[in-house]
Amino acid sequence: APSRHRITDYIQILLWSNCSNTNASTSRKNVALSKADFAKRVANQLKPYTTPAENTLAKEGETVFMNQCVRCHQVNGMKRADGTPVIAAPDENMVSGAAPNLSHLMSRNTFAGATFDLLNKSCREDVWTADSESFGDKYLSGVNEDCLNQKDLRGWLRNAPAMKPMYANPALLTSTGGKYRGMPNLGLTEADIEKLVAYLLTLK
C-alpha cells in the first residue's frame, strides 16, 4: 500500500469557497489533483489579465462589467482606457466588505458561493464521472461556451435575488446605510447580459 508520505506527495487538496459572508453557501468542492495538474492550476491562476479584442461582444461586456460590476467584484489586472487599474470597492458597497473575486471565473465549476453550477449538466457529469487518468485534464479545461450553464448564469445576471434571496435591496435596509447584503438586481438589459456572458467566458 502507498505510504502516507507518498499519498501526500501525490495529491494536493484544493478547497474552493469563492464566497463572502453575504452570498456564501455551505457547499464546498474538494478536488484531488496530481502534483503536475496542481502546478498547471497554479500557473493558470497566475496568468496576467488579457483584455478582449476590440470590436467584439466580449469587449463590450468588459465595459458593462466596469460600469456595473466592479463596485463589488474584482478582476485582477483589468485597466481602464487610460491605463489606470480597475479596483473593486466592496468595502464601500457591501455590508460584509467582501465579494467574490471573478478573476479566472471560468476555471471554476460553480458560482454564487457554490450555489449554482457553471457547467451544464452533461459537461458536469463528464468531468465528475471521469476516471482518475483523465479527470485532471477535464477539470482544468474549465468552462467554454458549449459547456456553460447559460440558464442559471443569465438568470443570476438578470435578477439574482429571485434565485437566491439575500436582502439585496438597500431601500429596505436602512440600518446598512444603503450597503448591499448580497448580489442585487442591477436592472441589466438583455443586451447587457449578452455582452457580460461573452466577457465572463474570457475569464479562464
What is each stretch, according to the model?
Residues N67-Q68, K151:
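Structural detector for helix-capping/boundary residues
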Residues L15, C69-C72:
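Short cysteine clusters
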Residues V31:
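Short, acidic/hydrophobic/Gly-rich beta-strand patch recurrent on exposed beta strands
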Residues S20, C72-K79, S107, R158, ...:
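Detector for the c-type heme attachment site
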Residues A1-L15, K40-T56, A88-L200:
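Extracytoplasmic electron-transfer domains, predominantly the class I c-type cytochrome c fold
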Residues N23-R28:
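Extracellular and select intracellular beta-sandwich modules with Ser/Thr-enriched
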